[in-house]
Design a protein with these regions (language model features):
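Flexible, glycine-rich surface segments
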Residues: 161-256
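Second-shell loop/turn segments in exported
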Residues: 37-44, 131-139, 251-252
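Acidic/His-rich structured neighborhood in mature extracellular/periplasmic domains
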Residues: 89-203
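Sec-exported extracytoplasmic/periplasmic mature domains
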Residues: 55-63, 154-158, 271, 275
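A cross-kingdom marker for long, charged
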Residues: 33, 215-305
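Positively charged n-region of N-terminal signal peptides that target proteins for export
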Residues: 1-5
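Start-of-domain marker
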Residues: 26-92, 103-105
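Bacterial N-terminal signal peptides
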Residues: 8-22
Length: 305
């Protein structure tokens, strides 16, 4: 049970264990928005209905075997930007996925995922159901949404227990493997978008060579952020330990999709978190950031003076 991962947290932050006869609540509280300004030749009602259908797909489907109360749901957002509407009800779009986790004993949250996916092509006719089959690729839109639902769960569970999200990353990888190489949909193949794709994203996470990434996720969030209020000095050491784990991956294999995801997700948090700390803390964080996020290292140096 995911509830076991929250031992010692406030009741508003840990997962209760239900009796089998009780109602099973879903895991996600997903906000869905569609920007269709570019689709001037399509009735806006089509996108309003699609937006509602996607929200229902994400929020009403059971993605795990664990039981969640309403206040335990993972807060996340799916932003779809329609780039082109074709005459055959086909759309080219981009997708931004953001997911947050609460920080124990505070009113703050930490962003776990901030992912921009440029490869979303799908077909949708008004009133069409959003079909989905975990074992078969039948709809690129729902397949992509499901991939990110499982990836969110994997990152969330990993942040509470070492490798706690394994089963969800495995499910995300199975979705990748179910897409035929001849599908014609970009984002699933190893060579799509200069390797910044779904294939490599989940492959990186599950690769034993990069276990330090997942170790860092747990140490940084559960042993670091969650303990800042109760034991700041110890928590800060754990935060730096988590950063060091991330740095090991960046040093071993620069430009990995998971490292790009990490930098995109955590940059603002790191700037705010470490900029007011003691010089030794800032120096240690900066050392790790040199390999975690080299493209923004000058900004970190400027803020950590």
């Amino acid at each position: 049970m995911r509830g076991a991962l929250y031992i010692g947290m406030l009741s508003a932050l840990f997962h209760l264990i239900f009796f089998s006869g009780q109602l099973q609540a879903q895991e996600l509280r997903a906000n869905v928005e569609i920007n269709a300004q570019a689709a001037t030749n399509v009735d806006p009602q089509v996108f309003q209905e699609l937006q509602q259908a996607i929200a229902s797909f994400l929020n009403e489907r059971k993605w795990s075997s664990d039981n969640f109360e309403d206040f335990e749901k993972i807060e996340c957002s799916f932003f779809i930007n329609i780039l082109e509407a074709k005459s055959n009800d086909q759309y080219n779009a981009s997708l931004t996925v953001i997911a947050n986790r609460p920080i124990y004993n505070t009113s703050y949250t930490s962003t776990l995922i901030n992912r921009f996916d440029k490869d979303l092509t799908f077909t949708y006719k008004q009133f069409d159901p959003l079909d989905f089959n975990e074992n078969q690729f039948i709809n690129n839109l729902t397949h992509t949404l499901a991939f990110y639902a499982y990836f969110i769960l994997g990152m969330d569970y990993d942040s509470y227990a070492q490798n706690g999200g394994e089963v969800y990353f495995q499910k995300a990888q199975e979705l990748v493997n179910n897409v035929p190489s001849t599908s014609g949909f970009s984002g699933w193949r190893s060579f799509d978008n200069n390797n910044q794709n779904r294939y490599w994203l989940v492959n990186n996470v599950l690769n034993s060579r990069y276990t330090s990434f997942r170790e860092g996720n747990y140490t940084y969030h559960r042993l670091g952020l969650d303990r800042l209020v109760d034991s700041k000095d110890t928590a800060m050491l754990s935060l730096l330990s988590g950063m060091s784990s991330f740095s090991e991956v960046g040093l071993d294999a620069p430009n990995l999709p998971i490292m790009q995801l990490l930098s995109d997700t955590k940059k603002l948090e790191w700037l705010n978190l470490f900029s007011e700390e003691k010089s030794d803390i800032k120096s240690a964080a900066l050392k790790s950031l040199t390999t975690i996020d080299p493209n923004n290292i000058e900004e970190y140096r400027s803020r950590f003076k």
